Amino acid sequence: MVIGLIGAGNMGSALARGLGEPLLVVDAERSRAESLARELGGEAPDSTAELCERADVVVLAHKPAQLDEVAAGLRARPRAVASILGATSVAALERAYPDLPVYRFMPNVAVEARRGVLCYAPGTRAGDGPERELLALFGRVGAVIELDEPLIEPATALMGCAPAFYALVVETLVDAGVHHGLPADRAGLMASEAMAGTAALLTEHRLEASALRRRVTSPGGSTERGLAALERAGMRAALSDAVDAVVEVGR
C-alpha cells in the first residue's frame, strides 16, 4: 500500500518516522517535504495532484484551514483518506471528499517512537475502503483505539497533550533533583527511566494506576510523605484543570 502524506509538520513527520517506510510527501514548504522524504527513502512529488495519482491512501497532516483547498487539488482518487487534522470532524472530511472513504485519527507524538496512542473514528463509508490495512499500518506505531466521534476531543486532551504533561513532570523532578545536588544529566536519566518503567508496569503488567501507587507507598514512608505534599499542592486538581482547558478549546 503506497502512502501519501500531505503535510510534513511536527505530527505528520512524527507519524512518518514511526512508520519508517518510504512515503510520498508534499508540504507547503517544499524543502521540508524533500528533507523528510530523503530521510525515509521516499519521494517528494511536485504537487498534491501527482501524489494522489500515485498513492493508495492519502494521510492529511496539513493545516486544518487548508482542508477544502487541498481537496480541490485532487484529480485522481486514492482508495481512502486518513486525517490527523486537529478539530476537523468526520462530517467536514466527508464534505471535502464526498466520494471517498474517510477515517479520522488523532495520534500523539509518541508515534515517532512506536509507542503512541491513536484515537480513531471511521466515516460513514469506511467499510468501502482499506480499513483493515489502514488499522494494521497505524497499529505499528501505537495503540489504535476506536471511539465514538464526540469522544475524540476529550481523548485528545488526555492522550494527545499527555506527552507534554508528562514531560513537565519529568522536567520538574529533574529541577528538584538538581536543587538537592544531583547532576542534571543523571537526574534526567533517572526521572525519564523511572517514568518509562512506571509506564511498562501499567501497560505490560496490566497494573491499575491506583494499585501501583498503593504498592509503592509504605505507611509512614517517604513515598507517602511525597504524595501528601502533592495532594496539598493540588496536583489532582491541576491535571484535571489542564484536561478541562484543552477540551474547552476543542468545543
Outline where the language-model segments fall.
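Small-residue helix-packing motif on alpha-helices
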Residues: 33, 51, 67, 183-190, ...
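Internal alpha-helical scaffold of NAD(P)-dependent oxidoreductase catalytic cores
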Residues: 39, 92-101, 117-155, 166-204, ...
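Short, well-ordered alpha-helix to beta-strand connector turns
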Residues: 22, 55, 78, 141-142
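NAD(P)+-binding Rossmann beta1-loop-alpha1 motif at the extreme N-terminus of oxidoreductases
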Residues: 1-57, 96, 115, 178-180
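NAD(P)-dependent Rossmann-like dehydrogenase/reductase catalytic/cofactor-binding core
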Residues: 192-251
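Rossmann-fold NAD(P) dinucleotide-binding segment
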Residues: 47-97
